[in-house]
């Protein structure tokens, strides 16, 4: 089971903030990461001049260092992409439940689409450290959007990249590259991709959802998702849900 979640508020200093593609950036920050306990959790970033914090998935972390990979989709993330080294940021860390590594089995499969790829990196790192044979499928629209392939390969993962237009790797969607056998799967990406993975897989697995959030810690109910046991808050009971509890909205 994922470890108990302990949210913390801390100041972090930007060590690196560089583009990986045209609109995807990698930000490395230094600060207190002790509130992060599970792969698949997220942070909430306070930006000057913006009322709502920005939720960003954790790509990787260790003692004193945090890596985020984010996409520029609006004014807030645009402002983030322009922040220089040395900038201090107010973060809520250790948000969300994270993935359950105990269910992985010997040969887990990780499936990421677009900016759903980053939270799978720390998961892969931990699974490899446990001696698992990890396979990864990374899905993008086109070659120019591909990132993180080499990072997963350096961990020792078997990696397949798919592009919708066929300009790089396997042509098609992540579901076109599913292997015949694997022990368990973990997936994160846009909701249409998650639904396609749900319908294409027979094994058990976990889904990490991306939703717009208000508070980020369960107070506002703005990111609720329907499940077999009622509505769950993506920011609190999620963002990771097990396959068998998901009810897709028609």
Description of each model-found segment:
Residues 51-58, 96-103, 235:
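Short, Lys/Arg- and Gly-enriched loop/turn segments at beta-strand edges
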Residues 16, 60, 161-163, 207-209, ...:
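Structural signal for conserved beta-strand scaffold positions within catalytic alpha/beta enzyme cores
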Residues 119, 210-239:
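Local cysteine-cluster metal-coordination motifs and their immediate loop/turn environment
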Residues 2-87:
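Ferredoxin-reductase
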Residues 75-212:
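FNR/FR-type flavoprotein reductase catalytic core
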């Amino acid at each position: 089971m994922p470890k108990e979640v302990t949210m913390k508020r801390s100041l972090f200093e930007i060590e690196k903030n560089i583009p990986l593609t045209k609109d995807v950036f990698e930000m490395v920050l230094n600060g207190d990461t002790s509130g992060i306990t599970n792969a698949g959790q997220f942070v909430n970033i306070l930006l000057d001049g913006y009322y709502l914090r920005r939720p960003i998935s954790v790509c990787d972390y260790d003692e004193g260092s945090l890596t985020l990979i984010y996409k520029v989709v609006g004014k807030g993330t645009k402002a983030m992409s322009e922040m220089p080294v040395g900038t201090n940021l107010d973060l809520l860390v250790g948000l969300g439940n994270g993935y359950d590594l105990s269910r992985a089995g010997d040969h887990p499969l990780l499936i990421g689409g677009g900016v759903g790829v980053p939270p799978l990196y720390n998961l892969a790192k931990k699974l490899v450290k446990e001696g698992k044979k990890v396979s990864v499928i990374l899905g993008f629209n086109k070659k120019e959007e591909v990132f993180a392939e080499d990072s997963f390969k350096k961990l020792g993962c078997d990696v397949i990249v798919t592009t919708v237009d066929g300009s790089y790797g396997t042509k098609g969607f992540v579901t076109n590259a599913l292997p015949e056998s694997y022990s368990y799967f973990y997936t994160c990406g846009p909701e249409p991709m998650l639904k396609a993975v749900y319908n294409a897989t027979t094994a058990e697995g976990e889904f990490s959802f991306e939703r717009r959030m208000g508070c980020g810690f369960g107070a506002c109910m703005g990111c609720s998702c329907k499940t077999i046991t009622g509505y769950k808050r993506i920011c609190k009971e999620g963002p990771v849900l097990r396959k068998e509890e998901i009810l897709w909205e028609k």
